[in-house]
Amino acid sequence: MRTALLEVGLEELPASEFHSILRQLEEKSAELLKAYRISSGSVEVFVGSRRFGVILNNLPERQEDFTEEKKGPPLNIAYDENGKPTRALEGFLRNNNASLENVVHREGYVYLSRVVEGKPVEEVLPDLFRDLVLGLNFRKPMRWGSGEHEYVRPVHWIVAMVDGRVLDLEIFGLRSSRISYGKRYHAGSIEIPDPERYYESLKKGFVISSHLERKKFVLEQIDEFEKRSGMKIERDEELIEEIVAITEYPRIVVGQFDRKYLELPEEIIVTAVKHHQRSFIAHKETLTNIFVAFQDGPQPPENVVKGYERVINARLEDARYYFQKDLETSLEKMNEKLKEIVFQEKLGTLYDKVERIKKISQRLCEDLKLPEMFTQKVLEAASICKADIASKVVYEFPELQGVMGRIYALREGINEEIATAIEDHYSEEPQTVIGSILGIADRIDTIVGNFAIGNVPTSSKDPYGLKSKADTIFRIIRKNEWDISLEELLTFASSLVKYHLSEELETFFAGRFYQFLINELGISFDVARAVNHLWKKPLRGILSAEALQEISEKPEFQDLFVGFERVHNITKNHDSTKFDGALFEKEEEKKLMNKFYEVKEKVLKALERLNYREALQYLIELKPYIDEYFDNVFVMVKRDDLRVNRLSFLKNIDELFMMVGDMTYLVKRSQV
């Protein structure tokens, strides 16, 4: 078995492309190996800040053979009346370098059928690797040199080998070789003897090509620091992944900043150090002034540590200045400054948005029938929920939006419940009732406002994150079990921006509700379709979906489905529900009618309590009565009055089933 290597060397990759390249290499390698008929035991993908590529293990000597077929002329044209090949057939064979031995007859035509031997892998791999490299997609590709080529970053070298042999490959005007390059400024060219020794060869040049090994190396150094220092480092997965993406040989740097900055709120310190210097803060019961960073390359000299300390101290000094300045201004005054900050050009300022959030929040409180005293807390929180956007700290550290609002509110002595809601309403899963109300109001205003000015998301573009905001609204409603009319809230919010609730906006929310049910709750496609019309009252749709999903996985679903199906199939083109029980002639009609009235009362009471599981169990009770009815009663009799009366009666049962969900969308399960 053979091993192949492809390495593409480039200028520094943006960290934002790291996971995309990794995923594409994995997917496209598998696709291309299949397309080129090459079986591979395993595919190793690697991505670093200055290189990416693949190692293909356990390759065969050759491609797999395949049977080639080509359609030729019809049989009546290919042969004469004596069964001899005509000129048409002879020309077809000659043009395809084939003989009569390769001819088969099928469906009235001549076909060429011949086994084509696979080529040696070293002949095929150059094309496969070229397709792989050129088949990658990037968010923001760039041109370089004469502008002839476009790629994520300028490409400087290519290594392409099978075993110890260099492949004949040229891309971007560069010919492949066995020469790679180590860490810039620390190592020059590195000769790769063969793919098996690729990783160890690069390590000599301070490059760990495998992203998995780099991550392991980072975590090992953190573990070692903790054992040595007795301190703890929070394993921030996002930061660790970023370090892995931007380094090729991450080495730990331990430094410290001035202890005076520990007087700042912890959130400011962590943000300044993490987001702006990609460093961790060490803990020992409480936050310490020790930080851990990662330098790319060999063991960092002392001046590197000093450099980190100088930059972090400067950032924290700036943060302290901004924080102290902010403390001189109340949230109320910050809120007034929102009049100078545009939310969106056609939707006014952030102050205007806050006013709309207050009105939507009040309407939501009314819908939820919340006490007046609690409603006042909600409105107080709403009035300052965006105030910190005007603060100096948030201007410098936008990721602290909401966090600083809570901190400043507590410093002013504002009720903790209100202060917490300022931060909480930004969360995709708010933990407080006030935060949940503000979270819904804020997101509804943003979605409705954007639709009002024509910023409608598409399947591929959603620059304002409206889909995610809609999903969060459904998530909040489910968590709090709020039986509210989303349609009425949207209509009210629309009136605040002089917009009429459009079919386009309704379609958007219906679509997001469908995706929410499937992606977040694990509801099957047919059940999601069955309840999708209930998006206007999301909690009911969610509870109905969960109940239907649960019963669809049990044997009794058969009784529910068959009972509904027998009734619905015969009444689907009938509209009236007016019937006269006095016209019933058979005992089975009367028994089903009596059972229907009994079940209907139970179902309606269960639905009043939003107990869809119970409602479904009651509906199942109808199944034997429905079966008995259809076994003994002929519905489509010639007498118009009897036929219409029976259809109208059955239509009542059909509509009772439909109260739980549109069961016409349900797919029959295999269980019995």
UniProtKB/Swiss-Prot annotation:
Primary site of residence: cytoplasm
Homology family: Belongs to the class-II aminoacyl-tRNA synthetase family.
InterPro entries in alphabetical order: DALR_anticod-bd, Gly-tRNA-synth_bsu, Gly-tRNA-synth_heterodimer, tRNAsynth_Ia_anticodon-bd
Reactions that this protein is recorded to catalyse: tRNA(Gly) + glycine + ATP = glycyl-tRNA(Gly) + AMP + diphosphate
SUPFAM superfamilies xrefs: Anticodon-binding domain of a subclass of class I aminoacyl-tRNA synthetases, HD-domain/PDEase-like
Gene designation: glyS
Name listed for the protein in its UniProt record: Glycine--tRNA ligase beta subunit
Record key words, sorted: Aminoacyl-tRNA synthetase, ATP-binding, Cytoplasm, Ligase, Nucleotide-binding, Protein biosynthesis
HAMAP family associated with the record: Gly_tRNA_synth_beta
Nucleotide-binding listed as a keyword: yes
EC number(s) from the headed UniProt entry: 6.1.1.14
Lineage: Bacteria, Thermotogati, Thermotogota, Thermotogae, Thermotogales
Cysteine pairings via disulfide bonds: none
